[in-house]
Amino acid sequence: MQWSAGAGLPGKVAVVTGAAGAIGAEVAVAFAAAGVSVLAVDVDSDGLANVLSMLEGGPHASEALDLRRLDEHDRLLRRAVDELGGFDILAHVAGVLIRRANLDEVTEEDWDFQHDVNLKASFFLNRAAGRLMRDRGAGGRIINFSSQGWWSGGFGGSVVYAATKGGIVSMTRGLARTYAADAITVNAVSPGAVDTPMLRGGLTDEQLEQQVSQVPMGYMAEPSDLAGAVLFLASDHARYITGTTINVSGGWLMY
């Protein structure tokens, strides 16, 4: 390996889902700062416009898309090739959380919505990405997002969400084995407590304080802390890492 400050990222093309959210936006900004062209994807068109305005360099593009539209995945990824000149990285950050006070409040709709977005759409998008990367013959990086809930089982009524994130870990391992021979790595990032609207939503101040008190480093992560892990996994420095879930939790989760 030849060492470089850019770690092989300048000139690459990344598709970032959930790009209008707190973590996804930071991932997109970090990629652009590293010389990567970004196709930012989210259901929030106004949020995408804001994120696109923050990206340096380029070219960049955005698309408002509900990833539950599985038949759009191939076209979406092909757009990165056609408009930005390639497809090297999928940073799949998109996810939803419906937190209920207890199990009895969980509805079938809660279950279906979270599994459709967090797990079903993730599998089919990962598969579409792996196929396109394999066909292009230049390898690639797929980076999924799990959660500390995959290990802990969730908190604050988020058991269904945790179940989907456990599925992400298993799926990531299986796809890593599937695509390894094609020089495509598949990994996941597992956040702990990150200061985002998703984390704060549905929690009382007391519950939030209790959660932060369990973090050995004593504070919540910022979205940029997660973006750093994504850039590492997308870089040449991580070329021999696959099937791994990187825990970014300030010591909250240790395994």
Predicted regions and their residues:
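Canonical Rossmann dinucleotide-binding motif of NAD(H)/NADP(H)-dependent dehydrogenases/reductases
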Residues: 7-39
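Conserved glycine-rich Rossmann-like NAD(P)H-binding loop of the short-chain dehydrogenase/reductase
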Residues: 34-50
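Alpha-helical segment proximal to the catalytic Tyr-Lys
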Residues: 131, 177-181, 239
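Short C-terminal tail/terminal secondary-structure segment
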Residues: 1-6, 97-100, 231, 242-255
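Active-site loop of short-chain dehydrogenase/reductase
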Residues: 12, 86-87, 133-147, 181-184, ...
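Substrate-binding pocket helix/loop in short-chain dehydrogenase/reductase
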Residues: 101-103, 107-115, 211
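Active-site helix of classical SDR
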Residues: 126, 164, 172
